[in-house]
Design a protein with these regions (language model features):
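Accessory alpha/beta interaction modules
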Residues: 1-153, 221, 288-293
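Short, catalytically relevant binding-site loops at active-site mouths
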Residues: 125-126, 162-164, 195
Length: 293
């Protein structure tokens, strides 16, 4: 089944690419954080928009929608979430852990970890409590007044909550904009103008096309990884029954690939099928890149 992509002109604030593009406007991003956190921020800096954190070739990587730091070295990851996959708590834990690992170099003191905020802006109520703002920090279960003070904060925003009135006018205006696109203050008007600018920008069009091409390539890589992982499993199951030549013929892979799989199985008996397949694909891509250069 072919995946259908929106045209740039069809994107809105709830689309990852559009959200990242709009938040590349420093003042808009800073003000969004100020509205959500209800505090003033002197300045922010971008380490890398839609930063990709990929720790190892066999580890799960993540691409962050917006990743910035402020003048106090606090880290902010802001994500748009449009699908209720029932895994947001675990996903937020994973994101925060990956961010921490990315910050801390091997051998560095844990004291170098920065205060981090993982913020999910959802178009649904992630906990079904009717709240528009869910903030989580680690506290002692037996004594809730005792905070762990590990400097990690998780926030989930639900614009459809029924308790917006306890927040400031800017927050209410932002929630209304997220729900309906309604413009009710200067900030939401600027957001709307920025979205319009992105839609007609040739530079953003070029970036969007580049992203679509990369995503399509990743889909192909994922398909290839799945096929190679299946091949590794079949080789493992039949290694004692057939030779490399016979396995190549039976499985439809060239003998060189089968031999590499066999070698990897013997050298790394503790590796699972996907890890072996990932390593083989990595080596092949490195070889292809060397040939091209």
């Amino acid at each position: 089944m072919t995946r259908k992509y929106k045209r740039l002109e069809e994107l809105e604030i709830w689309d990852d690419f559009m959200f990242g593009a709009v938040m590349s406007n420093k003042e808009l991003c800073k003000h969004l954080l100020e509205i959500i956190l209800q505090k003033k921020i002197k300045d922010i800096r971008y380490t890398e928009l839609q930063k990709t954190i990929d720790l190892q070739y066999d580890a799960k990587s993540i691409r962050l929608d917006v990743y910035v730091e402020d003048d106090l070295d606090s880290v902010y990851n802001i994500e748009i979430q449009t699908t209720d996959e029932k895994n947001l708590p675990k996903r937020s834990r994973f994101y925060q852990g990956m961010i921490d690992l990315n910050i801390l170099n091997k051998g560095e003191s844990y004291n170098k970890l920065k205060k981090s905020y993982v913020i999910f802006i959802c178009n649904y109520d992630p906990f079904g409590k009717g709240r528009c703002f869910y903030r989580f920090e680690n506290v002692c279960v037996d004594d809730p007044s005792l905070k762990l003070e590990d400097d990690s904060v998780k926030i989930m925003i639900n614009p459809y909550g029924n308790d917006t009135k306890q927040f400031g006018k800017g927050f209410v205006a932002l929630m209304d904009f997220l729900k309906t696109g309604q413009i009710s203050d200067t900030y939401t008007e600027t957001l709307k103008d920025e979205i319009t600018e992105v839609k007609v920008s040739e530079e953003w069009r070029r970036r969007y096309m580049k992203l679509l091409i990369r995503d399509q390539e990743n889909i192909e890589i994922g398909k290839e990884l799945g096929e190679l992982s299946t091949c590794v499993r079949q080789v493992k199951n039949n290694l004692e029954r057939f030779s490399a030549d016979q396995l190549a013929s039976l499985l439809g892979f060239d003998q060189a690939t089968i031999q590499k799989i066999i070698d990897s199985i013997q050298i790394h008996p503790d590796w699972n099928n996907e890890k072996i397949a990932s390593k083989l694909l990595e080596e092949r891509n490195e070889h292809n890149n060397t040939d091209e250069s």
